[in-house]
């Protein structure tokens, strides 16, 4: 399973990229606003920090407007992935862009039927929002299971990119189900490294090692 980080904070991205475990980045207008930088410039900077896909979202709502914005965004770097909303015009844009060889991430997916349409439109990635689904009284992971089943039934190549991840359980369940990618905030990804017993184990080993009076270097 691939790990993307959901942020436009270049310092956080660089920190995670240094682990060698980061496969890509997702951004959205809200994250760009939080970064407080020029959209084009920060996207270019992010594309230089990772080799994998960097999702940059259009803000136009009509097909023609989306295509114009996508033309600007995909010139930033070869690893830019155009992010479009799951609407009629969004899927028209997806079909056109993927037909030209451009990666497309279809976002704001909340039903398996929507995911089916995105796959038929040739989406590179589909982004179902599990956290927001949970917030509205549904089980977000059930949505991922349904999409996985449908995509496997028809051998769709669209990758399931689980979004709106709130905690480590979402990551674990995504892996169990067989999602292709997860995207999570930096804090959630960093939290995966941590376990209280790991910390206690290190403390114990170091205490015992200190008693030997030895050094390795």
Curated annotation (Swiss-Prot):
Quote the InterPro entries the UniProt record gives: Aldolase_TIM, TAL/FSA, Transaldolase_3B, Transaldolase_3B/F6P_aldolase, Transaldolase_AS, TSA/FSA_arc/bac
Enzyme category, top tier:
transferase
Entry EC number(s): 2.2.1.2
Give the protein's function: Transaldolase is important for the balance of metabolites in the pentose-phosphate pathway.
- Protein name, UniProt field: Probable transaldolase
GO biological process per UniProt: carbohydrate metabolic process; pentose-phosphate shunt
Which compartment or compartments is the protein found in? Answer: Cytoplasm
Q: What are the entry keywords?
A: Cytoplasm, Pentose shunt, Schiff base, Transferase
Q: Which organism is it from?
A: Novosphingobium aromaticivorans (strain ATCC 700278 / DSM 12444 / CCUG 56034 / CIP 105152 / NBRC 16084 / F199)
Q: Does the keyword Cytoplasm apply?
A: yes
Q: Which GO terms describe its cellular component?
A: cytoplasm
- What would be an example GO MF term here? transaldolase activity
- Show the disulfide pairing: none
Q: Which family does it belong to?
A: Belongs to the transaldolase family. Type 3B subfamily.
Matching CDD domains: Transaldolase_FSA
Can you tell me which residues form the catalytic site? Answer: 83 (schiff-base intermediate with substrate)
- The yes or no answer to whether the keyword Cytoplasm is present is yes
Give, as in the UniProt entry, the pathway in which the protein acts: Carbohydrate degradation; pentose phosphate pathway; D-glyceraldehyde 3-phosphate and beta-D-fructose 6-phosphate from D-ribose 5-phosphate and D-xylulose 5-phosphate (non-oxidative stage): step 2/3
Catalytic function, reaction form = D-sedoheptulose 7-phosphate + D-glyceraldehyde 3-phosphate = D-erythrose 4-phosphate + beta-D-fructose 6-phosphate
